[in-house]
Amino acid sequence: MEDKRGTYGNEAMYEITPLEMNLSSEWKQKEVLWGELHSQFESVQNYLFMIGDEERMLTIMCEGAALLPDSILLRYADYENLKKLGEFPTAKLEDYIQINHIKIAQLKTSNCSLLELSLDKYRRKDFEQKRKQIHDFIAGSERKSDFERLPERYKINLNGFIEAIEGSYSERMLVSFYKLIGAGRGLTPAADDAIIGVLAGYLLKLSLEKKADTYLEIVGPILANLCKEKLTTKVSLKYLKCACRGAFSQNLCKLIRILSGECKEGIRPILEEIRKVGHSSGMDMLYGLDMMLQRG
C-alpha cells in the first residue's frame, strides 16, 4: 500500500507488514540506527547496523523459511520488491524499518529465546526416548553433517569444549572454542553450527537442573571474544552471538521445547525441517546437540 504522506527521492513511500519478526531488546534504541546491505541471496538479505560499539546483523527473509533470531519474515511479493532496490540500499531503523522507500512495520516480536523454558510437563522417560530418536535420526540420515567430515581433531576439540562448558572451566572452554570456530566451508562453517547445537543442548540441560539463570554468565567469555575479534564469517558470527544470548532459530527452539515437554508435537517432523537447513547447517547443529545430550 502506498503512503502518500512521504517520498524517498522520486519514489512514494511503500508500507508493508511482515508475516513475523524477532528483534532482541538491543534493537529498540532511542536514536535512529543506520545500516547497509551486507549480503543478498535468493531468499535472504543481511543488513549491518552499529548498536553502541557492536556490529549487529538484521536478516530479512522470504516466506517459507523458519524465523531466525534478529530477523524479519516477508511475504513473497514484498520480498521480491525489496530485491529490486539495487546493490546499495540504505537501511534505517526507528519505530519501523525502512529500506530506501519501503517501510516495514514493526510487529510484536516472536519468541526465539530458550532462556525461560517451561518444564511443567517434563518427563524424564519421554526425554530419554526423544534423545535416542535424535541420535538414531542422525545415524540413519542420508544427508550427513559436514562436521563429521572434518579431521578427527575437531571432534576431540568439540568434546573438550563440551566438557569445559559443563564444568564451567572458562579458560579451557575458550581454548577449545578457538580450536573449533571457523572450521568448515560456507557462510556458516560446520564447526560453528555444531557449537550452536551444543549451546542449545547446554541451555536445555541447565534448565532441567533449574540453573538456566547461570547460562549468560557461563558463556559470557565466548560472547565477549566474538564481539571483539574477527573469528569467522559475519553471518556465522551473528548466529553464534545470538546463541550466546540464548536465542536460536524457531526450528531449533521447537525441538528443544519438544525435549522439555513444553511442546507435545512429534519429534520427527521438526528433525526433518532442521535437516533441510542450508547445505549441512541443520545436520551440523543436530550433531552438536546430540553430542551434548549423549553425555547424560
Report the location of each language-model feature.
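Phosphate/adenylate-binding glycine loop and adjacent helical scaffold
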Residues: E2-A164, S170, L180, A191, ...
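Regular secondary-structure segments
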Residues: L158-E166, C253-S260
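Short, hydrophobic/amphipathic alpha-helical patches that form generic packing surfaces
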Residues: E163, G182, A194-L204, R257, ...
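Acidic-glycine-rich active-site phosphate/pyrophosphate-binding loop
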Residues: I165-V175, L259-I267
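A contiguous, surface-oriented mixed alpha/beta subdomain in the mid-to-C-terminal portion of proteins
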Residues: Y169-A243
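Glycine/small-residue-rich hydrophobic helix-like segments
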Residues: E229-E262, I270
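Acidic, carboxylate-rich catalytic segments that either coordinate divalent cations
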Residues: N251-G296
